[in-house]
Amino acid sequence: MTLILGIDPGSRITGYGVVRDTGRGCEYVASGCIRTGSGELSERLRAVFSGVSEVIRTYGPVTMGIEQVFMARNADSALKLGQARGAAIVAGAEAGLQIAEYTATQVKQAIAGTGGADKQQVQMMVMHLLKLLEKPQIDASDALAIALCHAHHRQSLVPHGLIGAKRRGGRLRL
């Protein structure tokens, strides 16, 4: 059984989700949000790093999936998102986690069956797949979806011996 951490990065709210991959499916372990407030960017990035590090210490995942940066209309927002993502990746790398990156389309395809699914469709599928009785907060739901996507990709790669085949600096590029 493998514990998987999913991260939905953000400069103000970073969602996290932890699932246990049993080999026959995934079980919910934990989820939540790291709220950084509205202070200086450097302090918000430190809060992302510290928060992700604390989640890793608390739950002990061995691998992490994180969403790739998408091109936003606002270049400044995309840059800040990329920096928050970097802080989360460094926290995972510091802890020795294997890290994989997924596009939003890959996550939606893996969870809802279509890359065009909206956040509510993904949230409902996360609830169904993990047998949750209540809706998780949307950022936590997205992080759980990333963890489930990572579990799905890990299962499809293991029989072919591809896990770790394209590792660079601790990150698995798919």
UniProtKB/Swiss-Prot annotation:
Cofactor info, note text: Binds 2 Mg(2+) ion per subunit.
Task performed by this protein: The RuvA-RuvB-RuvC complex processes Holliday junction (HJ) DNA during genetic recombination and DNA repair. Endonuclease that resolves HJ intermediates. Cleaves cruciform DNA by making single-stranded nicks across the HJ at symmetrical positions within the homologous arms, yielding a 5'-phosphate and a 3'-hydroxyl group; requires a central core of homology in the junction. The consensus cleavage sequence is 5'-(A/T)TT(C/G)-3'. Cleavage occurs on the 3'-side of the TT dinucleotide at the point of strand exchange.
Binding site for Mg(2+) 2: 67
Organism: Stutzerimonas stutzeri (strain A1501) (Pseudomonas stutzeri)
Swiss-Prot/TrEMBL catalytic activity: Endonucleolytic cleavage at a junction such as a reciprocal single-stranded crossover between two homologous DNA duplexes (Holliday junction)
Assigned keywords, A-Z: Cytoplasm, DNA damage, DNA recombination, DNA repair, DNA-binding, Endonuclease, Hydrolase, Magnesium, Metal-binding, Nuclease
Active site: 8, 67, 139
Cited InterPro entries: RNaseH-like_sf, RNaseH_sf, X-over_junc_endoDNase_Mg_BS, X-over_junc_endoDNase_RuvC
Enzyme Commission numbers on file: 3.1.21.10
Subunit architecture: Homodimer which binds Holliday junction (HJ) DNA. The HJ becomes 2-fold symmetrical on binding to RuvC with unstacked arms; it has a different conformation from HJ DNA in complex with RuvA. In the full resolvosome a probable DNA-RuvA(4)-RuvB(12)-RuvC(2) complex forms which resolves the HJ.
Gene3D superfamilies cross-referenced by the UniProt entry: Ribonuclease H-like superfamily/Ribonuclease H
Keyword Lipid metabolism belongs to the record: no
Similarity remark: Belongs to the RuvC family.
UniProt-listed HAMAP family: RuvC (MF_00034)
Cofactor(s) annotated in UniProt: Mg(2+)
Any one GO biological process: DNA repair
Entry keyword annotation includes Transcription regulation: no
Annotated gene: ruvC
UniProt GO cellular component terms: cytoplasm; Holliday junction resolvase complex
Name of the protein this chain belongs to: Crossover junction endodeoxyribonuclease RuvC
GO molecular function (one): magnesium ion binding
